[in-house]
Amino acid sequence: MNTLKALTGVIAVMVLGGCATVTPVSGQFPPITPRQAQTGAENGKLVRWGGILIQAQPKAQETCFTVMALPLHQDGRPYLGRKKSDEGRFIACAPGFYDPALYAAGRELTFVGTVAGVQMEKIGGYEYPYPRLRAGTVYLWPLEVREPATSTVFINGGWGGGPWG
């Protein structure tokens, strides 16, 4: 009987563990931020960066994404509660075509790739040092559907009344 209980427990753990979602950007990565990589000292290092997409630019052989960096949750999803944090910006380029209609401004993205230098670009009139990422993985997070909040009004505090008294 104890063997049956143990076997049932093992099967339950395996079934429930199978429900866990593992994204292609999961794993352990060094805590290097785009702001730290602006100096160029982090070139060649494998990192996981993410944030809010500012712009996607398809080119002949690759698509480059300009991103406002945010801290990431453990699963790699950008932490939207920290939009005011100063993680900096970065440009991630990945081989192939990524449709700007799907990869639209405001979407959450996470990249895994190698730091590949610093690229100067203008933000308004300011020259900004964008760390450049050679992305091996591009992950577009699914949109979260938020249901509108509804409320129920109880008359008489929910007690009494109604058709039965």
Feature-to-residue mapping (PLM):
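Sec-dependent bacterial lipoprotein signal peptides
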Residues: 1-19
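OB-fold and OB-like single-stranded nucleic-acid-recognition modules
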Residues: 19-165
